[in-house]
Amino acid sequence: MYLITLLSTIVPILLAVAFLTLVERKILGYMQLRKGPNVVGPYGLLQPIADAVKLFTKEPLRPLTSSVSMFIIAPILALALALTMWTPLPMPHPLINMNLGILFMLAMSSLAVYAILWSGWASNSKYALIGALRAVAQTISYEVTLAIILLSILLMSGSYSLTTLITTQEYIWLILPSWPLTMMWFISTLAETNRAPFDLTEGESELVSGFNVEYAGGPFALFFLAEYANIIMMNALTTILFLGAYNNPMAPELYTTNFATKTLLLTMSFLWIRASYPRFRYDQLMHLLWKNFLPLTLALCMWYVTMPIMLASIPPQT
């Protein structure tokens, strides 16, 4: 039974990832006044399937000087972690209802750094290594603000469990009382998932393709799947944290529809941002975090800690 529930989560995620690639290419196409993929199937709808078949039937080449075991493990680890992070997400019922769901997700996203680092190092290529080091520095840096923002939100909800956030937001979305946090959270998720304008790891102009430059066929597809699964997961988490979907216990399907719509809109905004903005310079990326976001989030965290104490009240205990 547990295997069925696991598959009923993983299969739709992978399907969503497949069609997200198509949506991205379509949006970028129309924003650049062209059609995008429109040959395979009606309106290009079968393009993701054709891409998958092409990638997985290719020979998985690897450089002679590469470290074999790490080179193979890295993409598998990346996808495994990307899928593991979905377990505590309430949709409206999580796969595993964890008391420390948020902490688990932070730990998993930190582990994803290893997959990138190993892939860059095991490739034995200068470009891949520089791309991997950039990715690691960027991910670790932005995780600092993500953790502080999460702490501030949890102070409002009163529990580390994600399901409590649904109850907290019955009357008001947390985006309204904590909009500065929401803005910084959204920009940090862009950086965390290595998306434009923070896609320095894949800087085509200087690093060819970044940490996955030496990968071909299947392993490359696994990295690709992991990246897009992370994008959807981050937007799902944003929806749960700030745009709490309406939850009626009598009709849980309403929650799922509401949740999916908001996640889709946020994901579309990721693609819109990619089509609109140029890439940041590396030092600007770091300055934005360490000199702007970090002091601001720390100050706001202090504010959210002191407010209940000043008003002599505590958040609801669960």
Curated annotation (Swiss-Prot):
Summary of the function given for this chain in its UniProt record: Core subunit of the mitochondrial membrane respiratory chain NADH dehydrogenase (Complex I) that is believed to belong to the minimal assembly required for catalysis. Complex I functions in the transfer of electrons from NADH to the respiratory chain. The immediate electron acceptor for the enzyme is believed to be ubiquinone.
Biological process terms in GO annotation: aerobic respiration
Name of the protein in question: NADH-ubiquinone oxidoreductase chain 1
Annotated transmembrane regions: 3-23, 70-90, 100-120, 146-166, 171-191, 222-242, 254-273, 294-314
Record bears the keyword Repeat: no
Family of the protein in this entry: Belongs to the complex I subunit 1 family.
Localisation per UniProt entry: Mitochondrion inner membrane
PANTHER family: NADH DEHYDROGENASE SUBUNIT 1 (PTHR11432), NADH-UBIQUINONE OXIDOREDUCTASE CHAIN 1 (PTHR11432:SF3)
Signal peptide region: none
Alphabetized UniProt keyword annotations: Electron transport, Membrane, Mitochondrion, Mitochondrion inner membrane, NAD, Respiratory chain, Translocase, Transmembrane, Transmembrane helix, Transport, Ubiquinone
MF GO annotations: NADH dehydrogenase (ubiquinone) activity
UniProt keyword annotation of Chloroplast present: no
Catalysed reactions, as listed in the record: a ubiquinone + NADH + 5 H(+)(in) = a ubiquinol + NAD(+) + 4 H(+)(out)
EC code(s) of this entry: 7.1.1.2
Superkingdom of origin organism: Eukaryota
A cellular-component GO term for this protein: mitochondrial inner membrane
Topology with respect to the bilayer: Multi-pass membrane protein
InterPro entries, per the entry: NADH_UbQ_OxRdtase_su1/FPO, NADH_UbQ_OxRdtase_su1_CS
Pfam families in the cross-refs: NADHdh
